[in-house]
Amino acid sequence: MKKSILFITSFFLCVFCLKSNAQQSRPEVTWENMEGVTVPIPPQVHPRLYVRSADLPDLKKRMEHPHVKEVLATLNKLGKDRTPEEEAKVKDRGFRYYFEMRGVTSRVQVQALDYLVYGDKKQARSAITAMLDTLQNVNYGTKGDLSRASGVMLTCGAMVYDWCYDQMKESEKKAYIESFIRIAKTMECGYPPRNNEPIAGHSSEWMILRDMLSAGIAIYDEYPDMYNHVIKMMFKDYLPVRNYIYSGHNYHQGTSYVNVRFSNDLFSLWILQRMGAGAIYNPAQQFVLYDFLYRRRPDGQVMPAGDTNPIRKNMPSYSLPAMLASSFYKDSYLAYEYERKPNIERHCLIFDILWRDLDLKAKAPDDLPLTRYSGSPFGWMIARTAWDENSVIAEMKINEQFVGNHQHLDGGSFQLYYKGPLAIDAGAYQGSSGGYNSPHNKNFFKRTIAHNSLLVYNPDEKFACWNYGGGGKTEFATNDGGQRMPGDRWKTCRSFEQLLSKDYTTGKALAHGFGPDACKPDYS
């Protein structure tokens, strides 16, 4: 009897061990059907967030690179808490205050990175306890875009959780997960996240495509729900419409919001590729930022598009998306755009260490074709005479499909530049009357009248705009004689299906051409 009991006990122990080993032996991504979409499932190993074990030898070498040492020095400096005198001088504790990454958020990144690369357990322990204490005591809410501050907490916490995983106590893992869920519930998108802004809006920024995705990957083994919610949204609604838009080699949210919106498309690309899922987007994504190469004027400014604040003393910079895209696609032209003003936001500095291609050589765009056409859903063309200080630049727009949000009603418009702006997009995003949904914004700046386009004035025409969003709503906007407001009372497009519908179809480029030489055309 004792032998039987011993045999049965040994058998079950053996089965348990085999099952346990099987659960922990899936080192690579697998793909599963989840409610009608096939999605990547994180490997059951750590690290899997931003880096994998195979990346660590290269990362250790990178730590000796002068540029990486410089970034690390910056992070170490940022890791020092503000002095009481510095805190007293702070006037605004909006999300930008937290994006400065002073104190614990920079400190724990360096500590977790140190453990990841060099194995210093004391650094891991410091990062785990400091970040947990921070997570348990933050509650920013949504006022003033503070969801972005909450997102930084998810991202930093996720790094510590994943990179220091084998140094965490089970009680700490549980506490981290509880904090992630609590913080996510306070964010603008909510938790579970609402799938209502898959093309444009704040949910097409940090919250979903970087912050919640990162936390979900880190905690997947213990709590798969967060990742599952995000990945289903992405593969069902975010990816298909982006891949369609990328085929036009351009972007719809303008020359300012590309820094936050398109950057987060690139973050999700990098995050899932590093996890092991491969490149998830249409490779045409590589050429989106080429539009900004062509928009660049000899004076350093760019021809504006969409919501932007034209300030002559500040040269527009696209360093973050250019760094992410150039490094992923090994694109020397985009590396050139990055090096124009290599200034990565502080909450993204760690990715300059992890992902930037330090060997990629920049190449000026002066051997690119002088005319560039962006096909459906855009129908846009930019033509240049050269790349030097005497360049003439002309832009022509059709707008086949209209997304809205930070996009303007500027179909059929043109801009001209020669030694100065000759025909321009007028107005400013944040003027004396305010910003989004201000009288200036909805009655002039975003409207056709502020652009070089045809107006047909009908005194009886109504421009219903209640769904435009933001504060200061009104039932109607001023009649400018311009283009209709797509969607239900100017509501931002919320799905791929809507984008292709009659409501959001605003034109069609019937033909285009330039030549006879494709690189240096006589006509465009």
Give each language-model segment a name:
Residues 276-283, 300-306, 335-336, 391-395, ...:
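Acidic/polar loop patches that form or flank catalytic/metal-binding clefts of enzymes
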Residues 342-524:
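Catalytic and substrate-binding regions of extracellular carbohydrate-active enzymes
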Residues 24-37, 41-42, 47-49, 310-375, ...:
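Terminal, non-catalytic domain-edge segments
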